[in-house]
Every structure is written in structure tokens, then in C-alpha cells.
Regions:
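Short, surface-exposed beta-strand/loop patches at domain edges
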Residues: 55-70, 167-170, 175-237
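Bacterial N-terminal signal peptides
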Residues: 9-16
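Extended extracellular/luminal ectodomain segments enriched in beta-structured repeat modules
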Residues: 100-109, 118
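Sec/Tat signal peptide C-region and signal peptidase I cleavage site
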Residues: 17-21
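Positively charged n-region of N-terminal signal peptides that target proteins for export
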Residues: 1-5
Length: 237
């Protein structure tokens, strides 16, 4: 009976996933296309010592206390360019944070893995607009993301001048495609530091060049996620 139940659960779990029918072996999409799983993790390296010493951690869901497990290697939220996968819409992702004091942001770090296409994305710091990402405060075009399914490198975007943010005001870190990344397929890794409390995330979907977003076309949609996206916002007081 136990074996039969386990087999049934396994079949149901596999039924909720769909194999990625392209050149990347071991990459599986959820049925709705929103999540990516790496079933064959790639070679990982321990993250090099960070240059974040002395910086204020305004928000941090990257497990720096555990350099061999700063985030979960093998599952993440889908980021698609408009021509990345035939039959799939364009997807962007965002994670919210609220500073408890006034700060100056000088660095944003994200745990995002590259699957295929152009290895580059846009990272942005955004204001809030009624609970979803609003206007871009600052954006960075970033290339050379680590391979999805590996751990534990992160990608950083810096601003030497600094960006002022206000206490008790919600902001968003956005990872999206740009002009050069129309065929990019990537995934924002889920965090490993808190698997109890939910985090506010949002996705943006566009079916202008294919796929279907239903009633959510070309708008941000927010929701709670457990676990949330792995990212950090650093700076000074």
C-alpha cells in the first residue's frame, strides 16, 4: 500500500512538470511555465570572498553564513525573453523589500542562473505602485550570469554615487529582459534562508509575441511566495 501511494504521488508530481523541449538537457518547466527545475545540477563552486565587508545589509535573503549553500541551486522563477521558447510568453520577475531606516543603496545582488540564449539581463531598483513594481529608479544591463543549476555565485550591480531610499517604504528589485535579451532563458533562484515565512514577489507577463498570459497580459501581478527570490540590497546608513 505504501509503495502504491508513493508511486501515485511520484506520477502526480511528474504530471505537473513538462520537459523543456530544446537543447538543454535536465531543464524542466512547471506546467504553467512559471518555475524552472534543474534535474541535473551542474558543477558548482564556492562563492569567492565578497567585497561587501563594511556595507549595510538593507535586505538580504542570500545565505552568506553558508558559503556552500547561499541559495537553492536547482529551482527558480522563470525569466523569458519574448522569443526564448516557442509557445511561451515573456516573463519578468521581482522581489519586494522595505527598509527599516533611511539608507543609500550602492549594490544589488541577485542569484539568477542562465539557461540559454543571450547571457544577459537587466537588473533594476524600482519604486512601488500600489503593491507592484512602479517606476524604475535605476537599471543596470548585466552579462555573464552563472549556469542555472549551479551554486553559489551571485551577480552584482553597483552604483558608486548611491541611491537614496526611505524608511518604511516598499521598493522592488526587478530582473527583466532587455533589447539584447529577446531570446534569453534564465531563472531567479529561490532562497534558502527562510522556508517558513512568505515573501512578496511579482511577475510580469507579455504574450504580445506568443504564448498566453490570460488576463494578466502586460501587467505586474503580485503574490506571496515560500521561499522567495534570493537577492540582497546593500549600501550605507
Amino acid at each position: 500500500m505504501c509503495k502504491k501511494t508513493l508511486l501515485t504521488l511520484t506520477v502526480l508530481a511528474l504530471a505537473s512538470l513538462t520537459a523543456f523541449a530544446a537543447s538543454k538537457d535536465g531543464i524542466v518547466l512547471s506546467k504553467d511555465g512559471r518555475m524552472v527545475t534543474a534535474t541535473k545540477p551542474t558543477k558548482s563552486t564556492v562563492q569567492a570572498p565578497s567585497s561587501d565587508a563594511g556595507m549595510v545589509k538593507i535586505y538580504d535573503s542570500i545565505g552568506t553564513a553558508y558559503p556552500k549553500g547561499t541559495y537553492w541551486c536547482c529551482e527558480g522563477a522563470t525569466i523569458f525573453g519574448p522569443t526564448a521558447i516557442s509557445g511561451e510568453p515573456e516573463y519578468w520577475e521581482a522581489g519586494a523589500f522595505t527598509p527599516t531606516a533611511d539608507h543609500t543603496v550602492t549594490k544589488v545582488e541577485v542569484a539568477v542562473g542562465y539557461v540559454e540564449g543571450f547571457n544577459g539581463l537587466v537588473i533594476g531598483l524600482y519604486s512601488d505602485a500600489s503593491g507592484v513594481p512602479g517606476k524604475a529608479i535605476k537599471t543596470w544591463s548585466v552579462t555573464n550570469f552563472p549556469q542555472f543549476g549551479s551554486c553559489c555565485a551571485v551577480v552584482a550591480a553597483s552604483d558608486s554615487t548611491g541611491i537614496s531610499i526611505t524608511a518604511n517604504t516598499q521598493y522592488w528589485v526587478v530582473v527583466k529582459t532587455g533589447k539584447k535579451s529577446s531570446n534569453t532563458f534564465a531563472a531567479w533562484n529561490v532562497e534558502d534562508v527562510d522556508q517558513v515565512d512568505s515573501e512578496l514577489t511579482a511577475f510580469w507577463c507579455s504574450d504580445d509575441k506568443g504564448g498566453s498570459c490570460g488576463s494578466d497580459n502586460d501587467v505586474w501581478v503580485a503574490g506571496q511566495a515560500i521561499p522567495g527570490h534570493a537577492f540582497a540590497v546593500l549600501g550605507s546608513n
